[in-house]
Structures are given as C-alpha cells and as structure tokens.
Design a protein with these regions (language model features):
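Acidic, turn-prone loop/beta-hairpin segments
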Residues: 1-29, 33-64, 83-86, 103-108, ...
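A glycine-rich helix N-cap at a beta->alpha junction
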Residues: 67-94
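Cys/His-coordinated zinc-binding microdomains
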Residues: 133-136, 154
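Short linker/helix segments within small regulatory modules
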Residues: 138-148
Length: 180
C-alpha cells in the first residue's frame, strides 16, 4: 500500500476529527428531531452551525459545498462537502448563535459538547431528489428532462444515457397477466 494512502498531513487529521465531532453533535440534535417526528432520515434535515473561532471556521469553510446540487461542483470537490460528511441535505454555517436560534426551534439547538459549535437542525428546504434523496430547492424547477431529480443527478442520468444509448425509465416493466 502506498504511504500516501495511509499517512496524512496533520491538518487533514485535525479537519476530519473536527468533522467527526461535529457529526456527533448534529446527530444528537437529529435524534431529538426524529423522536418528535420533525425529520425521518438524516437527509430530511438541514443543520445550522455557528463556529466559535476562526481556526475552526476556516476548516469548515473549506468543506462548505455549493448551496444547490450542481454538476460539476463549484466550491468543493463535491464529495467531501460538509453535507455529505454529515449525511444531511443542507448545512448552513452562520455568523452567530442567534442565527442558529432564529433558524431552528429552541428544542433542536444545542452547544455541541464535542465540536464546541452551536448546532441546530430543522426540516430541509426544497424537494427530495428521486435519485440521491438529498433535498434541493431547485428540484422540479429547472425544466430538466427528469423533473424529480436535482441538476447533479439529471446530469448523471444524461451521461449514462449518452454512454450506453439506453433511456432511463423509473417505471418498472409491466408484466402482462397471463391469458386464461
């Protein structure tokens, strides 16, 4: 195994330790929201996060992806986004604890014990993509060939159709009833 696969710069280790801690704090709030039937799956949720210091904010800003699910991604590589790492449809880094409280009901807001961030959760905005299940505010609004998909998934389906010559269909093959 190449050493580049098994050893990382300290900044990477610190970054992912922070993300894991933030994920733990978000998951605590998600459990409360699930118990109250505010959300079901984690992709039904959006998180609002206030970061207490500049060093932490700098790390999280690097992972803050595009607001919409676009292809190709603009702000990050599209894989290591906070939303993907936290398994949420949306993550909003905000500038104050008050902004978290304004966006989320008080019962779903907490000062994270592990990350030190103030974290709140609420129902994600937009519609659920029929392929990736992330919520996106532009699903069904862009006039795409597959109206129930986000732009990123529509692009993936288009690429697949182009490469294979097949047409994507969500409808299952209809099995005809045998004639008696």
């Amino acid at each position: 195994i190449p050493s580049s696969w098994t050893s990382f710069e300290q900044v990477d280790e610190d970054q992912w330790a922070l993300v894991r801690n933030l994920r733990d704090d978000v998951n605590q709030m998600l459990e409360i929201a699930r118990n109250d039937k505010l959300v079901g799956a984690s992709l039904d949720a959006a998180a609002f996060v206030h970061v207490p210091d500049e060093a932490t904010r700098t790390i999280l800003d690097k992972l803050d992806g595009d607001r919409d699910l676009v292809s190709p991604p603009v702000k990050t590589n599209g894989v290591d986004d906070l939303r993907t790492s936290l398994m949420l449809s949306q993550v909003n880094l905000v500038n104050s604890e008050d902004a978290v409280s304004e966006a989320c009901e008080a019962i779903y807001v907490s000062k994270g014990e592990k990350s030190g961030c103030t974290v709140g959760v609420r129902q994600a905005e937009g519609s659920k993509c029929g392929r990736c299940w992330f919520y996106d505010e532009k699903v069904g609004k862009l006039g795409l060939p597959h109206a129930d998909l986000c732009q990123r998934c529509d692009d993936a389906i288009f690429s697949w159709e182009k490469a294979t010559g097949n047409k994507f269909s969500k409808e299952e093959e209809k099995v005809e009833e045998p004639v008696p």
